A protein has these predicted regions:
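Generic alpha-helical structural context detector
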Residues: 35, 121, 156-159
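Glutamate identity and glutamate-enriched acidic tracts
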Residues: 8, 15, 40, 84, ...
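Substrate-binding/access-modulating region of protease and related hydrolase catalytic domains
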Residues: 126, 142-221
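Short, flexible active-site-adjacent loop segments at beta-strand->alpha-helix junctions, enriched
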Residues: 3-6, 43, 72, 142, ...
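Subtilisin-like serine protease catalytic core
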Residues: 25, 29-30, 52-153, 169-178, ...
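Protease zymogen maturation seam
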Residues: 1-64, 78, 213
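Hydrophobic transmembrane signal anchors and adjacent membrane-proximal interface regions, especially
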Residues: 11-21, 87-92, 198-200, 205-217
Length: 221
């Protein structure tokens, strides 16, 4: 089949709007992002006014393990606490839990940059997060003073840890693992196979751009 014969995908909904919102917690403003991303109707536009709408947490991450692979995590952040005030952050030894040979660095559970803490707040923070009841795990891949682990160990530890998970008695299956890696890396894609050949062979390259500072950046996807 020729690539030209493949029909264009039809979007479910298309919205435009100004995402420059404040993080005020007046009314329902703390959840404007969750509402904005799950509604086919553009509810906010350029307005920062409270629309009187609440975000219904039908799915809140209960029974799910979320892993942030980044610059680390601020351990004592109040956003990780559950409704009882207990932190959902699980400070495990990745080498011990995965069975991978190695030593976890000292000060592994720190974040001198802040990016990892920011990302997990979006993922699972109790105020602005999507999965506010999920368990939180952190792997420091980009750290300072030798507190990070290598790429190879990160992959091996994640696989080994997930494979070693016990059955969750609440569900009868292993807890799902969701891993977030919010960072960039540069490489070249081999152009020997043409884009048509790549797509028709069911192989995909996911290239995404975002979260840059400032307004002068041009994104190419």
């Amino acid at each position: 089949q020729d690539i030209a014969d493949i029909p264009e995908p039809t979007p479910v909904a298309v919205q435009t709007g100004n995402f420059n919102k404040t993080t005020t917690q007046t009314g329902q403003q703390d959840n404007w992002g969750l509402i904005r991303h799950t509604s086919e109707t553009q509810l906010y536009g350029a307005s920062t006014a409270d629309q009187g709408i609440t975000y219904d947490y039908v799915l809140d991450g209960t029974g799910v393990d979320m892993v942030i692979v980044d610059t680390g995590i601020q351990v004592g952040h109040p956003e990780w606490r559950d409704s009882e005030g207990v932190s959902r952050l699980q400070q495990i030894n990745w080498y011990t839990e995965s069975g991978v040979a190695g030593t976890q660095p000292a000060n592994f559970y720190t974040d001198t940059n802040g990016h990892g803490t920011h990302c997990i707040g979006t993922m699972a923070g109790k105020t602005f997060g999507w999965a506010k009841n999920a368990n939180i795990y952190s792997i420091t891949l980009y750290g300072n003073s030798g507190n990070a682990i290598s790429w190879n160990d990160m992959i091996d530890c994640l696989i080994g840890w997930h494979n070693n998970k016990p059955i969750d008695p609440a569900t009868g299956v292993k807890r799902p693992t969701v891993v977030n890696m919010s960072f960039q890396y540069s490489w070249y894609i081999d152009t020997s196979p043409t884009p048509d050949q790549v797509i028709l062979s069911s192989t995909g390259y996911n290239i995404l751009g975002g979260s840059h500072r400032g307004v002068a950046h041009t994104e190419t996807t």
